[in-house]
Amino acid sequence: TVKILSGNRLYFAVHKIIYAILGGFIMSDYQSMDKNALESELKNLKAEYEDYKAQGLKLNMARGVPSTAQLELSLPMLDILKSDSDCLSVSGADCRNYGILDGIDEAKALFAQMLGVKPENVFIGGNSSLNMMFDTIACFSENGVAGEQPWLLQGKIKFLCPAPGYDRHFGVTGFFKNIEMITIPMTENGPDMDMVEKYVENDSTVKGIWCVPKYSNPDGITYSDETVKRFAALKPAAKDFRIMWDNAYCIHDLTDTPDTLLNLYDECLKNGNEDLPIMFCSTSKITFPGSGVSALAASKNNLDVLKSRYKFQTIGYDKLNMLRHIRFFNNYEGVVAHMQKHKAILAPKFELVISKLTKELGDKNIASWHNPNGGYFVSVNVLNGCAKKVVALCKEAGINLTGAGATYPYGIDPNDSNIRIAPSFPPLDELAKALDIFCLCTKIAAIEKLLDK
């Protein structure tokens, strides 16, 4: 006997058959699925997950480490200085010997262009800008700045921390036990400036703020012109408030439509606030991490304070390495041309990340991300309460990610939602598999969260 269905009953019967045939793809928004559909989807996803676990994979997307191919771009630099090389700087200084506390002139000229300041505002350091940031905080903590008492003698002080942000920044200020870190939410234009202004201009215990202004770590956001201008126009309640402007990705573009960052130092000069910023960068992700050259830029007042410490700390940093870098690049244009080679290696990896996220998660309503024009990371926000679960699932399947919460002060993500993806190190084939597993784990964690509601 054939039973004829009509009206709504016919519609729902047909819909049910089609849904069964297509495996639920009609309703791909997980937050719109009913319990039965979610449970069915979860069963299939877990079976796929067990298959990956059985493969015994060891894949790494934890940190922004340049790949072997990127490191090989700078190998010719190792041949620049040989036993018969002239080791004199442009000023005639013998780079093999002691001296020149703030670095050779040609290095200061190059980094001045990278940071957008004059050479006299530049201090050349060793192989690590993070080291210079730590030394700066230590100097102000132990010796003070702007004629004020050392921070260590001022009791509990505060440092503003835009988040998600760079975990090693938070590690530096977290090391100093009298510094309380205050989370400032990031927006699409940079830190929440209403909140920044409220803290800085009304609380004299607020002494500084961390910033990665171009291609921020991990969001890949570049601060808007308005944000930079508001930083430059700050009227701090504390004379010794300083902006730690870590311009780590100042020339690390990935697309043909790169972001542009307004020059903070120029804007500060317009406002009579040239003492506000301490600016940093390095060649760590340009040549060899750990064997590069770092630099900071600041006003004369700030440099005088910093040099008063550095003159006891060192006689001068590695001038041969400075010379090697300068002769390898020749000039700023040489650095820019070199970065195009990095772009050729990195861009396909970032394109793959965005493609995989869009294909696997784009219509699931369980994750969001920013498509950066440069930098080293893609920041993914999964459903609230799921980041730790996703990272744990990935680890069990052999995928190493930055720890959930690491992008927030004290390692505490209030929403447990942010995950940083670092695609630079793995080869494309390994990256593709790691991303497949990441997306799979994101789906599993999301469905389990939705079923728990």
Where are these regions (language model features)?
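Conserved core of the PLP fold type I
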Residues: 93-239, 250-272, 387, 439, ...
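N-terminal "arm"/small-domain region of PLP-dependent enzymes with the aminotransferase-like
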Residues: 28-102, 106, 112-113, 396-399, ...
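Short, Lys/Arg-enriched N-terminal segments with co-localized hydrophobic residues
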Residues: 9-26
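Conserved glycine-rich beta-strand-loop-beta hairpin in the small C-terminal domain of fold type I
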Residues: 60, 340-354, 366-381
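PLP-dependent enzyme catalytic core of the Aspartate aminotransferase-like
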Residues: 26-28, 35-36, 41, 87, ...
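Conserved C-terminal alpha-helix-loop-beta "cap" of PLP-dependent enzymes
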Residues: 45-53, 302-303, 307, 313, ...
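Conserved core segment of the aminotransferase class I/II
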Residues: 266-347, 360
